[in-house]
Curated annotation (Swiss-Prot):
Organism from which the protein derives: Pseudomonas fluorescens (strain SBW25)
Matching PANTHER family: METHIONYL-TRNA FORMYLTRANSFERASE, METHIONYL-TRNA FORMYLTRANSFERASE, MITOCHONDRIAL
Leader sequence residues: none
Keyword Ribonucleoprotein included in the entry's annotation: no
Gene name for this UniProt entry: fmt
Catalytic reactions of this protein: L-methionyl-tRNA(fMet) + (6R)-10-formyltetrahydrofolate = N-formyl-L-methionyl-tRNA(fMet) + (6S)-5,6,7,8-tetrahydrofolate + H(+)
Protein name from the UniProt record: Methionyl-tRNA formyltransferase
Length: 317
């Protein structure tokens, strides 16, 4: 067995924290953790530490939160840690070449897609939105480009017809950490070779935008059904009903015709809404001031709100 490595970890959200947990139970030494500065969150907008910071503090690991790693001071601080390897998972900052050159064995990244497909910020949601049949985690050696480095390991998982952005996230958060541990072992032993990405196959997973979550009922129902799943639990697809906000948390593909956004059926099975092609059966909704409910519960208590012929939302022209 090779000697334990001095590892610096850089990550921010829960997906990254799962990877840090695995490193903390490995033979290697996590000597410091980098994470994004604390951000305001919740109704009170109190400053909240990231999941990675919370985990690091629980294990008495030094936490660094520089707003950038592009200046000489931040780079000198990293170099002083004398890391063998920098492990990066959903950190949120671009690492300049000067940083990538500091660790003895370089820098690796766990990315939640099967690269080169879905480089970028939101690979999990974009894979569901696009109707991909599979996803996975790629562990790659980092270089200055965005998710362009040589691929060291891949693990795959099917995307099911029931998967949401949340369920796929959770599955990939389980698959990624063991792959990172395996990749570290290969790098330490000098037995792992990287596979160059084919840039001609690259697609980009642009950052999620809340405006994208507004449902355009003129789109085909098959696209909207995937969007509803992809954007759950955030940013949640939404429309309006009689001028009030309506969040759509779950829906199924259905047959039916009418003006886009028109309610063409309502029963305990769901709210049937016409789309540009086919229809969506909305099965879980949230009204203003209320909690998310299955439509069967809303149908029993608020049936009058869902009159046939009512048109949801603003249809794009």
């Amino acid at each position: 067995m090779t000697e334990p490595l001095r590892i610096v970890f850089a990550g921010t959200p829960e997906f990254a924290a799962e990877h840090l947990k695995a490193l903390l139970t490995s033979p290697h030494d996590v000597v410091a953790v980098y994470t994004q500065p604390d951000r305001p969150a919740g109704r009170g907008q109190k400053l909240m530490p990231s999941p990675v910071k919370q985990l690091a503090l629980e294990h008495n690991i030094p936490v660094l939160q520089p707003p950038t790693l592009r200046n000489a001071e931040a780079q000198a601080e990293l170099a002083a840690l004398n890391p063998d390897l920098l492990v990066v998972v959903a950190y949120g900052l671009i690492l300049p070449q000067a940083v990538l050159d500091i660790p003895r064995l370089g820098c690796i990244n766990s990315h939640a897609s099967l690269l080169p497909r879905w480089r970028g910020a939101a690979p999990i949601q974009r894979a569901v939105e696009a109707g991909d049949s599979e996803s996975g985690v790629t562990v790659m050696r980092m270089e200055a480009g965005l998710d362009t480095g040589p691929m060291l390991l891949k693990v795959t998982t099917p995307i099911t017809a029931a998967d949401t952005g949340g369920s796929l996230h959770d599955r990939l958060a389980e698959l990624g950490p063991p792959a990172v541990i395996q990749a570290i072992a290969g790098l330490a032993a000098g037995t792992l070779e990287g596979e160059v990405q084919d840039d001609s196959l690259a697609t980009y997973a642009h950052k999620l935008n809340k405006d994208e979550a507004r449902i355009d009922w003129s789109r085909p129902a098959v696209e909207l059904e995937r969007l509803v799943r992809a954007f759950n639990p955030w940013p949640i697809c939404h429309s309006t009903l009689n001028g009030e906000a309506l969040k759509v948390l779950a829906a199924t593909l259905a047959e039916g015709a009418g003006a886009p956004g028109e309610i063409i059926g309502a029963s305990k099975d769901g709210l049937l809404v016409a789309c540009g092609e086919q229809a969506l059966c909305l099965t879980r909704l949230q009204l203003p001031g209320g909690k998310a409910l299955n439509f069967s519960d809303l149908f029993n208590s608020r049936r009058e709100k869902f009159a046939l012929g009512t048109v949801l939302g603003v249809v794009a022209q």
